[in-house]
């Protein structure tokens, strides 16, 4: 007789996704990051829910309410620091997850990949509106600068900006709607993650060799459930270490000052996880050009499956592509560094060169390397 986990309408779905799911035997630790992202999302939703109970989305009270959470609410300081640093770990896992997909050719599962890119954009939007909520100096000026970029759109730009602001400047209406969006988006992300998983389970997981593994699969539980558990322990230990020993390491000191529309901070910059995109934005002197470059720096991921020219899926046996991949990683680090620097020589030219290399790697060098490797195979 079949067990309840296989016959029950609801439990059978969970069984198919997390228990009896056939998984390739040889998937490495790089395949842990999907579940780690799920853990990050749950952590952020739970801590965010408790923070929202004590937060006040009003410009005269927002900063004070965050201070009140940290001082007066039981374990409020802990919740706030877990939530703030959890965002950083979320993005670390996200970038590693995307890097894994690029290296091993997982992007050839087009539906899964494109839903993943949409998820990436949603997470970025959520993090942006969330950063505005404490209403510190960098919150206010970050919101002003980034929302102002929409004015670069021809004809509708200015109207669009005022529509998003809910007035003629970043004000109370802006804070209220950003709080609404920040509360809503994580649940949208959770829903989109389900679609991401649905598409993934249509094809099954890729593996480090990039070969068909249907002949050699094992059940997800107990093998990979325990492997994921190890990842959970390491991630949570890292989060606790960061939160309890150095909670403000990744934050901007400017955000400890309440928002003041009359005083502009000397260097306006986003959180570290947006610096690479910010560097690409700043590398183009034209406003509209910069905004488009910013947009395409993320959307370019969607064309990766189209520009894949190699006969092999994974980069495991493709030395040229491996060199390009690690060049991209180095380039991302350079862009992240440049994004945090002032706009002056030599940082301007370094940022421009790094931005050109970033796009060239995706559009020119990767397809070219695949083609050359195909030729090398035929020799």
From Swiss-Prot:
What PROSITE patterns is this protein classified in?
CYTB_CTER, CYTB_NTER
Per UniProt, what is the membrane topology?
Multi-pass membrane protein
**Please, which domain of life does this record's source organism belong to?**
Eukaryota
Paste the cofactor note: Binds 2 heme b groups non-covalently.
**UniProt: a ubiquinone binding residues:** 201
InterPro entries annotated for this entry? Cyt_b/b6_C, Cyt_b/b6_C_sf, Cyt_b/b6_N, Cytb/b6-like_sf, Cytochrome_b, Cytochrome_b_C_euk/bac, Cytochrome_b_N_euk/bac, Di-haem_cyt_TM
Q: Which UniProt keywords apply?
A: Electron transport, Heme, Iron, Membrane, Metal-binding, Mitochondrion, Mitochondrion inner membrane, Respiratory chain, Transmembrane, Transmembrane helix, Transport, Ubiquinone
- Which cofactor is essential here? heme b
UniProt-annotated binding residues for heme b b566: 97, 196
Q: Name one GO biological process term.
A: mitochondrial electron transport, ubiquinol to cytochrome c
List the Gene Ontology MF annotations in alphabetical order.
metal ion binding; ubiquinol-cytochrome-c reductase activity
Q: Name one Pfam family in it.
A: Cytochrom_B_C
Name the residues that span the membrane.
Answer: 33-53, 77-98, 113-133, 178-198, 226-246, 288-308, 320-340, 347-367
Which residues does the annotation say bind heme b b562? 83, 182
Gene Ontology CC annotations of this record: mitochondrial inner membrane; respiratory chain complex III
Where is this protein found? Mitochondrion inner membrane
Q: Which family, according to UniProt? A: Belongs to the cytochrome b family.
This chain's function reads:
Component of the ubiquinol-cytochrome c reductase complex (complex III or cytochrome b-c1 complex) that is part of the mitochondrial respiratory chain. The b-c1 complex mediates electron transfer from ubiquinol to cytochrome c. Contributes to the generation of a proton gradient across the mitochondrial membrane that is then used for ATP synthesis.
Give the multimer and partner information. The cytochrome bc1 complex contains 3 respiratory subunits (MT-CYB, CYC1 and UQCRFS1), 2 core proteins (UQCRC1 and UQCRC2) and probably 6 low-molecular weight proteins.
Q: What else is known?
A: Heme 1 (or BL or b562) is low-potential and absorbs at about 562 nm, and heme 2 (or BH or b566) is high-potential and absorbs at about 566 nm.
Q: What name goes with this protein?
A: Cytochrome b
Q: Which species does this protein come from? A: Amia calva (Bowfin)
Lineage of origin? Eukaryota, Metazoa, Chordata, Craniata, Vertebrata
């Amino acid at each position: 007789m079949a067990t309840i986990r296989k016959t029950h309408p609801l439990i059978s779905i969970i069984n198919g996704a997390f228990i009896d799911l056939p998984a390739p035997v040889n998937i490495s630790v790089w395949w842990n990051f999907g579940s780690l992202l799920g853990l990050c999302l749950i952590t952020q939703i739970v801590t965010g829910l408790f923070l929202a109970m004590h937060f006040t989305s009003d410009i005269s009270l927002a900063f004070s309410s965050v201070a009140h959470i940290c001082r007066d609410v039981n374990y409020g300081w802990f919740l706030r620091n877990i939530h703030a640093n959890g965002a950083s770990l979320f993005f670390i896992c996200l970038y590693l997850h995307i890097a894994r997909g690029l290296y091993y050719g997982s992007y050839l599962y087009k539906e899964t990949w494109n839903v993943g890119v949409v998820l990436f954009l949603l997470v970025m939007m959520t993090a942006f509106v969330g950063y505005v909520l404490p209403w510190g100096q960098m919150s206010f000026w970050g919101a002003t600068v980034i929302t102002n970029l929409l004015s670069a759109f021809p004809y509708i730009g200015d109207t669009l900006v005022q529509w998003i602001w809910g007035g003629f400047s970043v004000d109370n209406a802006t804070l209220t709607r950003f709080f609404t969006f920040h509360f809503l988006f994580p649940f949208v992300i959770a829903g989109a993650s389900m679609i991401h998983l649905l598409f993934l389970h249509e094809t099954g997981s890729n593996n480090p060799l990039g070969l068909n593994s249907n002949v050699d699969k094992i059940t997800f539980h107990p093998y990979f459930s325990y492997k994921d558990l190890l990842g959970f322990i390491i991630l949570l230990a890292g989060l606790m270490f960061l939160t309890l020993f150095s909670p403000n390491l990744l934050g901007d000191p400017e955000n400890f000052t309440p928002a003041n529309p009359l005083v502009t901070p000397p260097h306006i910059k986003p959180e570290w996880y947006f610096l690479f995109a910010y560097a690409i934005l700043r590398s183009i002197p034209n406003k509209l050009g910069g905004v488009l470059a910013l947009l395409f720096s993320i959307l370019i991921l969607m064309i990766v499956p189209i520009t894949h020219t190699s006969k092999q899926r994974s980069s495991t046996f493709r030395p040229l592509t491996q060199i390009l991949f690690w060049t991209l990683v180095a380039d991302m680090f350079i862009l992240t560094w440049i994004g945090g620097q002032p706009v002056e020589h030599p940082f301007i030219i370094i940022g421009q060169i790094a931005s050109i290399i970033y796009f060239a790697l995706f559009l020119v060098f990767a397809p070219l390397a695949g083609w050359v490797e195909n030729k090398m195979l035929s020799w």
